[in-house]
Amino acid sequence: MKLFQIEEPDGSPADPNAPGAAVGIDVSGPVAEVAVAIGGNAAVLADRDGFEVDLRVPPAAAAMAEWQTLIERARLRAERSLARPVTHAVVVADGSAGERVQRAAAEAQLVLLRIVTPDQIAGPEPRVLTAAILAEDLAPRIAAPE
């Protein structure tokens, strides 16, 4: 049996150390939302039928494990929807939940680009979309090949 390797268009293999996608996560409501932005256009990510993930937001004083589970599930939703790794996020969280979110993201190995409170986001767009656009702006860029 012969195996073959799929290469990138320029012929070089993909960089396994390159940063993954950056998403916006809103945990300020009763159920978390996840979104991604490309070129400044954001879209809310949803689960496929039969693969739903429970994203109920725990109380601010809940155990750290509950917050970590929420962050991991939000990341899972994003990775399934995008079919690529997610490594960075901007999270919308009430002030009381900010510390929990920060610790949970660290445990889940998700790099927090910023935590914003709901009152820091103005405008008619849903907060998760604004967070996704901010995540795209703050995410590390992949260097162009030389």
Describe each PLM feature range.
Residues 19-21, 28-114:
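Conserved phosphate-binding loops in N-terminal lobes of ATP-dependent enzymes
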Residues 2-46, 125-146:
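Gly/Thr-rich phosphate-binding beta-strand-loop-beta motif of the actin/hexokinase/Hsp70
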Residues 1, 6, 60-64:
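Detector for methionine-enriched segments
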